[in-house]
Amino acid sequence: MSNRKPYVREMKRTWWKDHPFYRFYMVREATVLPLILFTLFLTVGLGSLVKGPEAWQTWLDFMANPLVIAINLVALAGSLFHAQTFFSMMPQVVPIRLGGKLVDKKIIVLAQWAAVAFISLIVLIVV
């Protein structure tokens, strides 16, 4: 065994703030935090739906709280931001060819947003 001390590079907690790519990545990944709260709110809502009308009304009153509405709006914005970054990466990860030619990246991204809009419309009609 060697008595030499291995070199350990110092790393500050804020290492990711120095580079725009990593800063963007950390912000993108942080969008999951309000989504966790949104998911918990919905899970509690399902539980209150099972418990009865009084519990359901209590949950509806809770969901009408301005703080909860703000959290839900932040979760929606985070979801849209996450989707936009995912959709913009998709043509680079999976290039689509039609007739031997690459499909323009903008068309692929717009097609994904059109699919989101269509599915959202279907859900709004059904619900």
Curated annotation (Swiss-Prot):
Membrane topology of this protein: Multi-pass membrane protein
Residues annotated as signal peptide: none
MF (Gene Ontology): succinate dehydrogenase activity
InterPro entries named in the record: Fumarate_red_C, SQR/QFR_C/D
Family matches, as CDD domains: QFR_TypeD_subunitC
Gene3D superfamilies assigned: Fumarate reductase/succinate dehydrogenase, transmembrane subunit
A GO CC term assigned to this protein in UniProt: fumarate reductase complex
Residue stretches in coiled coil: none
Pfam families (UniProt xref): Fumarate_red_C
Subcellular location: Cell inner membrane
Keywords: Cell inner membrane, Cell membrane, Membrane, Transmembrane, Transmembrane helix
Residues spanning the membrane: 30-50, 67-87, 107-127
UniProt subunit comment: Part of an enzyme complex containing four subunits: a flavoprotein (FrdA), an iron-sulfur protein (FrdB), and two hydrophobic anchor proteins (FrdC and FrdD).
Family: Belongs to the FrdC family.
Role description: Anchors the catalytic components of the fumarate reductase complex to the cell membrane, binds quinones.
Name assigned to this protein: Fumarate reductase subunit C
Organism expressing this protein natively: Vibrio cholerae serotype O1 (strain ATCC 39315 / El Tor Inaba N16961)
